[in-house]
Amino acid sequence: MTDMRRLGQRAKQASLLIAPLSTQIKNRFLSTLAKALVDDTQTLLAANQKDLANAKEHGISDIMMDRLRLTSERIKAIAQGVQQVADLADPIGQVIKGYTNLDGLKILQKRVPLGVIAMIFESRPNVSVDAFSLAFKTNNAIILRGGKDALHSNKALVKLIRQSLEKSGITPDAVQLVEDPSHAVAEELMQATDYVDVLIPRGGAKLIQTVKEKAKVPVIETGVGNVHIYVDAQADLDMATNIVINAKTKRPSVCNAAEGLVIHEAVAARFIPMLEKAINQVQPVEWRADDKALPLFEQAVPAKAEDFETEFLDYIMSVKVVSSLEEAISWINQHTSHHSEAIITRDIKAAETFQDLVDAAAVYVNASTRFTDGFVFGLGAEIGISTQKMHARGPMDLEALTSTKFYINGDGHIRE
């Protein structure tokens, strides 16, 4: 029996053991875990330093190092996130509908756990805790497989969670970490249909594509953010400037950061110099511009076809000039990763058309795409941003980690 198979068996058994846990027990444990994270900050930072040292040795960029880095403040924020999950309403057992049918059967549809969730993710060690807390709150066991660059951090975090579970009298196998970073083991997890009920990949386009090609278990796609902002002919250009600066430069390494700028030709000659001057005062950006946009920049490079398909996660942005709203919508739908898209305009009809026709989980009017986030949407914590349409779409909250079951009660009923 392989290690992955043993891990899967333990996760399946754990899912049955935690399925009956009450809301009170779950919330009490999550509060305990939140405190333990803060109390054990120095141990977690020491583990993270090993990952940072390895990353530096391998020449990882400063932006990617930032994704990997833990600090006392970040650990405190992770702990606060766990407590916020404890404070959320528990969806498990919620009655969606109930009725008595014509045969006199009493029928209830309730929310129930999915069972075993597997998560494959990259870089950010906070995902270990975020994903566990959401899975635990919904009575799911979880198998975590992080990137090798965050292995020491993930091991320390999962060890702390397992110790806390054991001290609370709860099976520590409610969370398990795949420590082998090999692709073969990851592929085995993707195909563990006997044990895994759903797989959630969270990372870059290459990871998502690999999972889509290799997985045999059900998959919920998340994460890739080839996000666009369209500056319409009727845009407030000051507003557009502020929004683009925020969406591109505030945190370029996150999936809701803007990667592509689409501009109506009626305002391009005014807007591009205005934006370039303003953004250079905050954080210079490398512009990869099409033929119409290129001569309007003081400093830019010609865009290649692949630039319009790329999630840069850096201070780089593609630029496309279009002649109409319809062309903008068509261009975005051709290149979007279906995450978040935005239009800047004072034209109400254009805004409504854009929101109706752009194929993305979140579509903004006159706002930064950086708001696509479970907490910001008032949903509480999220396990990722789903970019597909089935089961869940957009920020995945607690309800997205549940299924439903019909409970039918009769009194000797038989069907004639």
Swiss-Prot record:
GO cellular component, as recorded: cytoplasm
GO biological process: L-proline biosynthetic process
Pathway: Amino-acid biosynthesis; L-proline biosynthesis; L-glutamate 5-semialdehyde from L-glutamate: step 2/2
Keywords: Amino-acid biosynthesis, Cytoplasm, NADP, Oxidoreductase, Proline biosynthesis
EC category: oxidoreductase
Pfam families attached to this UniProt entry: Aldedh
Amino-acid biosynthesis in keyword set: yes
Molecular function via GO: glutamate-5-semialdehyde dehydrogenase activity; NADP binding
EC number per UniProt: 1.2.1.41
Protein localization: Cytoplasm
The keyword Cytoplasm appears for this protein: yes
Known catalytic reactions: L-glutamate 5-semialdehyde + phosphate + NADP(+) = L-glutamyl 5-phosphate + NADPH + H(+)
Chief subcellular location: cytoplasm
Signal sequence range: none
NCBIfam families: PRK00197.1, proA
PANTHER family listed in its UniProt record: DELTA-1-PYRROLINE-5-CARBOXYLATE SYNTHASE, GLUTAMATE SEMIALDEHYDE DEHYDROGENASE
Protein purpose: Catalyzes the NADPH-dependent reduction of L-glutamate 5-phosphate into L-glutamate 5-semialdehyde and phosphate. The product spontaneously undergoes cyclization to form 1-pyrroline-5-carboxylate.
Protein name as catalogued: Gamma-glutamyl phosphate reductase
Originating organism: Streptococcus pyogenes serotype M12 (strain MGAS9429)
Gene assigned in the entry: proA
